[in-house]
Each structure stands twice: as structure tokens, then as C-alpha cells.
Regions:
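Nucleic-acid nuclease catalytic cores
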Residues: 81-123
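Well-ordered beta-strand positions
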Residues: 49, 69-71, 110
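Solvent-exposed, charged helical/coil patches
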Residues: 1-45, 105, 116, 122-123
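Structural motif
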Residues: 58, 63, 72-73
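Conserved catalytic cores of phosphodiester-cleaving nucleases, focusing on short active-site segments
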Residues: 25, 70-84, 97
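Structural motif corresponding to alpha-helix initiation and N-cap regions
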Residues: 64-65, 91
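A short acidic/basic microdomain associated with nuclease active sites
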Residues: 44-60
Length: 123
């Protein structure tokens, strides 16, 4: 059986998301969940960047940019959504983020009426 990439860190991040959901519940805008996650990341002394801009280049020319919700410990991209389910465009989005950032692991978490759902995406 193969070992998960950044297993301990990813489970800590997922635990934070569940903690925030358990305290806030469902029904808020994504930005409020993100702000609560910032508080919890700080409590856990995790190094993170929020709304990280990643530029996309072609032949040394800037052709676009992405804004990642979180990069945690310079290892994991965390993308948070408030939605009913996972959508294909969300998966494509986080894969693009991983490719552009050069990071190996992304966590796509969605906040639903029924709770938290998440996927670990490996680049």
C-alpha cells in the first residue's frame, strides 16, 4: 500500500475545515468560511498564504494568472467552495492550480447542506 502525500498535514487541514463547519454550520458565503479557516490555521501555527497570485507564462510572456484560496506550508493548495456537489470545472481548476504552482497536492473541499466533502488531488 502506498503512503499518502503529506498525510499528516492534509488530515490537519481537513480537520480544520470540519471544525469551522461544525462551529458555523451551513449557509454563509465562501469568504466567511475562509476567514474562519485563517483563524484556525494561525492557531495551529501553520504557514500559509491566502489568495496567492500565480502567473502563467508562455515564452517569457505573461498570459494570465490564477488566485489560489490557500497555499499551506508551501506544499498543499486548498480550494474551498460552497456548493451542492463537486463539479468537473472545480476539478479542472485545482489541477490547473497545481500545474501552475508546481505543487504536488491539492485539497478541494466543498461546504454543503449535509456537511463537508473533500477530495485530495495529486499533480
Amino acid at each position: 500500500m502506498s503512503k499518502l502525500i503529506y498525510e499528516d498535514l492534509s488530515y490537519k487541514i481537513i480537520g480544520i475545515i470540519f471544525k469551522v463547519y461544525n462551529k458555523l454550520g451551513y449557509g454563509y458565503h465562501e469568504k466567511y468560511y475562509q476567514r474562519a479557516i485563517v483563524i484556525e490555521l494561525n492557531k495551529e501555527n501553520l504557514n500559509f498564504t491566502r489568495e496567492k497570485e500565480i502567473r502563467l507564462s508562455y515564452q517569457n510572456e505573461n498570459i494570465g494568472k490564477y488566485f489560489l484560496d490557500f497555499i499551506i506550508e508551501n506544499k498543499i493548495v486548498l480550494e474551498l467552495k460552497v456548493a451542492n456537489s463537486f463539479y468537473p470545472q472545480d476539478m479542472k481548476q485545482i489541477l490547473s492550480y497545481l500545474k501552475a504552482s508546481g505543487l504536488k497536492l491539492g485539497i478541494l473541499a466543498i461546504i454543503t447542506k449535509g456537511g463537508i466533502e473533500y477530495k485530495r488531488i495529486v499533480n
